[in-house]
């Protein structure tokens, strides 16, 4: 056992030395913005999954799994998307509990995702209004992150300062989630109200893209103290890229994000 531990410790040390000597700007160091624009396909041509109008594509989905999902979605037709009380967020400083807040937040997103997939599969319109309610409810949340990730400062004291949005794991994930909703439901949303997609873009830009472009986040690393990026970095950045690639009115180009 001691030999095994020593082996992995040595492997870790060697790996650290190897990675420290490798260039960190593999993408930006290889391609210029102009070259990226030539390499990347136009956003309109990027179709990672069949659109809701591609019935032939969705006919290939696993029927048994989709029927189960459809039944689950039917059980949510009477679900009311709740707001999250401030006192649920305050629990993080009052009792240390993070689960009550997260249970409400995660449930809302799980329900919305189930309704979304059911509507995509069935395409009869009966889940649209409930999806609209879900999107609007998420957009009206004060923060898309979780209280456990709030700064431990008297200024916050268990609540988000909505004038100073910052990006944690779940905020970034929510931005990508809403961009997928828009990707699949955009045309149906336009038939309901143009304000739906406009709200998604507004909230995503305000809460996610603008803070990421204009302010330093500790998980980014390498500012003045020599800190390294932490494990939040790849998750948030991957959601950042996915979100921008599907948000067609985001003010910064996708190639600009990549560099």
In which residue ranges do the predicted regions lie?
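Non-membrane alpha-helical segments in proteins
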Residues: 107-121, 133-137, 172-183
């Amino acid at each position: 056992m001691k030999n095994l531990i020593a082996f992995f410790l040595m492997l870790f040390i060697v790996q650290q030395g190897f990675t420290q000597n490798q260039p960190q700007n593999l993408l930006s160091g290889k391609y210029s913005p102009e070259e990226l624009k030539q390499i990347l396909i136009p956003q309109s041509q990027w179709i990672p999954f069949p659109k809701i109008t591609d019935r032939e594509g969705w006919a290939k989905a696993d029927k048994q799994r989709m029927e189960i999902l459809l039944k689950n979605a039917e059980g949510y037709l009477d679900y009311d998307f709740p707001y999250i009380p401030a006192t649920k967020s305050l629990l993080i400083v009052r009792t240390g509990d993070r689960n009550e807040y997260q249970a409400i937040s995660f449930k809302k997103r799980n329900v919305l995702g189930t309704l979304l997939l059911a509507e995509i599969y069935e395409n009869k319109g009966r889940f649209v209004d409930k999806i609209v309610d879900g999107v609007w409810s998420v957009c009206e949340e004060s923060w898309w992150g979780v209280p456990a990730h709030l700064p431990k400062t008297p200024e916050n004291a268990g609540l988000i300062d909505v004038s100073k949005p910052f990006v944690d794991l779940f905020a970034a994930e929510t931005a990508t989630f809403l961009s997928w909703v828009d990707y699949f439901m955009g045309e149906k949303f336009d038939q309901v109200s143009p304000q739906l997609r406009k709200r998604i873009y507004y909230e995503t830009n305000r809460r996610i893209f603008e803070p990421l472009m204009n302010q330093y986040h500790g998980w980014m690393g390498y500012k003045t103290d020599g800190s390294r990026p932490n494990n939040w970095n790849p998750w948030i950045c991957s959601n950042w890229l996915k979100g921008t690639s599907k948000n067609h009115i985001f003010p910064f180009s996708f190639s600009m994000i990549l560099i």
